[in-house]
């Protein structure tokens, strides 16, 4: 009886030891990145890690400079597509886990040849590494408040539309921000008098879903399915005669997009 008890304890201890070993390995893999979702506009150590792993796997051909630009964005999307992940250009938990799983590499080797110091082609990656920064993770030119406000607007204006139509609404907001005919801030565009129905009827204050947020990020990252439209309207509900005078570009879902 005593021997059985000792045997059970030994098995239990072995199981605990194995669990701790697995947890340690998983923790080591996770620690390759911080916990933040890495997206275009981010910079620092997380981006160096991301670029190095994408480069090792043959998806990224640019410099490992710690700046998440368009080259890194499209390389990441191609990696996600290849490995059956959601293709959104965001390095979240699942994407980072797959990167770690798919990569066995020496980061210092991956970084060789990517230095930019003139007259020092033999410099090491460590010598030319940008300052450590794991906190910058907002698309260029836009704050988290901008992204949240746009998600509210997209959800309030187009939550019943296909995904392409939601990206299109976000793109119109961005097109107005860069147009001389409109305010040059996200909040200025959205809260301009009589600009958006969702503001007038209060739907702007509904809590947006993840689809609306993703549509905003896709638009910020350069996807404009409207062809640079500045206006849109629903022909079934529009009461303005003026909107019908605008040159029409295309129809997406229930909305007609115009110049």
Curated annotation (Swiss-Prot):
InterPro entries cross-referenced by the UniProt entry: Cell_wall_hydrolase_SleB (IPR011105), Peptidoglycan-bd-like (IPR002477), PGBD-like_sf (IPR036365), PGBDSf (IPR036366), SleB_dom1 (IPR042047), Spore_cortex_SleB (IPR014224)
One Gene Ontology term of the molecular function aspect: hydrolase activity
Signal sequence extent: 1-32
Main subcellular localisation: other
Renumbered residue ranges of the record's region Disordered: 109-142
Known role: Probable N-acetylmuramyl-L-alanine amidase. Required for spore cortex hydrolysis during germination. May form a complex with some hydrophobic spore component, leading to a stabilization of the enzyme in a spore-bound form.
Protein name: Spore cortex-lytic enzyme
């Amino acid at each position: 009886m005593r021997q059985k008890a000792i045997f059970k304890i030994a098995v239990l201890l072995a199981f605990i030891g194995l669990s701790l070993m697995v947890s340690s390995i998983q923790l080591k893999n996770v620690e390759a990145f911080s916990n933040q979702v890495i997206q275009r506009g981010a910079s620092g150590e997380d981006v160096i890690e991301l670029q190095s792993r994408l480069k090792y796997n043959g998806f990224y051909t640019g410099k490992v400079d710690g700046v998440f630009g368009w080259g890194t964005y499209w390389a990441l999307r191609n990696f996600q597509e290849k490995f059956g992940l959601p293709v959104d250009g965001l390095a979240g938990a699942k994407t980072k886990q797959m990167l770690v799983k798919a990569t066995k590499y020496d980061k210092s080797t991956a970084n060789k040849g990517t230095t930019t110091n003139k007259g020092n082609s033999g410099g090491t990656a460590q010598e030319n590494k940008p300052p450590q920064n794991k906190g910058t993770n907002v698309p260029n030119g836009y704050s988290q408040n901008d992204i949240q406000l746009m998600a509210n607007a997209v959800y309030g204006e187009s939550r019943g539309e296909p995904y392409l139509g939601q990206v299109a609404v976000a793109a119109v907001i961005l097109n107005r921000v860069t147009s001389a005919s409109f305010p040059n801030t996200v909040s200025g565009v959205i809260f301009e008098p009589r600009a958006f129905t969702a503001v007038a009827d209060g739907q702007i204050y509904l809590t947006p879903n993840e689809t609306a947020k993703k549509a905003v990020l896709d638009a910020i990252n350069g996807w404009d399915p409207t062809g640079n439209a500045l206006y849109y309207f629903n022909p079934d509900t529009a009461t303005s005669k003026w909107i019908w005078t605008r040159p029409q570009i295309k129809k997406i879902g229930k909305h007609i997009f115009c110049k």
